[in-house]
Design a protein with these regions (language model features):
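Short coil turns that delineate tetratricopeptide repeat
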Residues: 52-53, 127-128, 161, 214, ...
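Short coil/linker segments at helix-helix boundaries
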Residues: 64-121, 125, 142, 147, ...
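Canonical tetratricopeptide repeat
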Residues: 60-61, 135, 188, 222, ...
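Register position in tetratricopeptide repeats
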Residues: 67, 142, 195, 229-230, ...
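Terminal, low-structured helical/coil segments at or just beyond the last alpha-helical repeat
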Residues: 189-214, 271-299
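Alpha-helical adaptor scaffolds
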Residues: 174-246
């Protein structure tokens, strides 16, 4: 009976602690997007006094300093902003566009570094909290600090080998499928790196992932795609063929194989793989396959 009573007390205390953590986090969420940074600071200070060892307090401080460091600056230039950002066009007396005015983000680096120090401490103390390094990566991407992004990825992947992808998230909630979350996140980051023109870093990330998951189709396809884009067809083709062998229903892979053979001028292989796409269910790919087969037959 004493053991049962003790267990009930422990569970009750645990539930009370969990509820307290949730309450503080909810209070934080209610004011984090408010423009009043002083109120946010006061709230985090109170939270820290109540839960000084909480990784979420460290994360809250990080977000506070990021918020404090960011300012919007008005840019006046003769070139249009990138990434389809909205801008006010300035016309000259003849009605011709003479310039553009738009807002850009600016950061106070000294304040930003305080935020990074807070988060670095949290990452060191709580290495299984995956949201912490990913939160840092988000800001590093915005600053275009890609070498530092890659270092965070390396640290995360090294940790994954130690913890078996048993990751935690906000409020120390365990992730149900840590391996899937890791892979899916790294795939998103791969796309971000490539879209940012960082193909070398994108390639490095793929190599790291394949060292851990050599049979993963998505990262094998990423590697083959990067090689094909670089016109290194002799290296890309065997990878695509091995993926196709594992997953013959992948019409994108089949299309890439057919395209490489078409580019290399291999008539027999071009006809073979494009013929597999004539009834793939994608009208655009089917149309291209018919056109390419017609061309190949005339070689």
């Amino acid at each position: 009976m004493r053991r049962i009573i003790t267990l009930i007390i422990i569970l009750t205390n645990y539930i009370s602690i969990a509820n307290a953590q949730n309450n503080w986090y909810e209070k934080y969420l209610s004011c984090v997007n408010d423009s009043d940074v002083h109120a946010l600071k006061t709230m985090i200070e109170q939270w820290e006094q109540a839960e000084p060892e909480s990784p979420d307090v460290y994360a809250a401080w990080y977000n506070y300093y990021i918020k404090l460091a960011m300012t919007d600056v008005v840019a006046l230039t003769t070139t249009a902003p990138e990434d389809n950002q909205e801008a006010l066009q300035l016309m000259d007396s003849t009605g011709v566009v003479a310039g553009y005015m738009y807002g850009i983000e600016s950061y106070n680096d000294s304040i930003l570094q305080i935020g990074y120090q807070k988060l670095n401490t949290a990452i060191k103390l709580f290495p299984d909290r995956l949201d912490l390094p990913f939160g840092k990566v988000a800001m590093l991407f915005r600053q275009q600090l890609y070498s530092e992004v890659m270092q965070e990825f390396r640290n995360v992947l090294d940790r994954s080998k130690k913890n078996g992808n048993r990751w935690l998230w906000t409020l120390n909630q365990p992730l149900d499928d840590g391996e899937y979350i890791l892979k899916d996140s790294m795939q998103d980051y791969f796309v971000q790196l490539y879209d940012a023109g960082q193909s070398d870093y994108a390639s490095q990330l793929v190599e790291w992932m394949l060292q851990l998951y050599p049979t993963d189709i998505i990262f094998r396809a990423n590697k083959a795609s990067l090689l094909a884009i670089a016109k290194r067809y002799s290296e890309a083709l065997p990878i695509y063929l091995s993926i196709y062998e594992d997953n013959p229903d992948d019409i994108i892979v089949a299309s890439n194989i057919a395209h490489i053979y078409y580019t290399l001028g291999d008539k027999e292989a071009t006809l073979k793989y494009y013929s597999k796409l004539l009834q793939c269910g994608d009208s655009e790919i089917e149309g291209l396959a018919k056109q390419r087969m017609k061309e190949a037959k005339s070689w």
